């Protein structure tokens, strides 16, 4: 399945717009990661634990969106966007959405 953040694909024709599709996941922080993040905030550096957490969350949300698009008969999702929000103390939602289409 083709996933893109642009509205058109050069050389491809959109033959049908199927509508909005989305995927999301809510993740919470790990106490051990919080301790390491606190130290990194003092000394500087990448928060690798959080980087991995967000990479996993993006992948899961994207797979959920693709599954919804396939269920609608799409072979592509265009104009894809990611968003994050805090849903509770220590927990965040990663949300991805786009337009399911049939391309040829």
From Swiss-Prot:
InterPro entries associated with the record: UPF0145_dom_sf (IPR035439), UPF0145_YbjQ-like (IPR002765)
One Pfam family recorded for the sequence: YbjQ_1
Superkingdom: Bacteria
Family assignment from sequence similarity: Belongs to the UPF0145 family.
Protein name: UPF0145 protein HCH_01985
Source organism per UniProt: Hahella chejuensis (strain KCTC 2396)
Lineage: Bacteria, Pseudomonadati, Pseudomonadota, Gammaproteobacteria, Oceanospirillales
């Amino acid at each position: 399945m083709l996933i893109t953040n642009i509205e058109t694909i050069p050389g491809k024709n959109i033959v049908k717009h199927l509508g909005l599709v989305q995927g999301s996941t809510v993740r919470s922080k790990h106490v051990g990661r919080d301790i390491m993040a606190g130290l990194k905030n003092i000394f500087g550096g990448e928060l690798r634990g959080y980087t991995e957490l967000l990479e996993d969350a993006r992948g899961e949300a994207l797979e959920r969106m693709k599954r919804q698009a396939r269920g609608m008969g799409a072979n592509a999702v265009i104009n894809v966007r990611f968003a994050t929000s805090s849903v509770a103390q220590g927990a965040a939602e990663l949300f991805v959405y786009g337009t399911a289409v049939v391309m040829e």
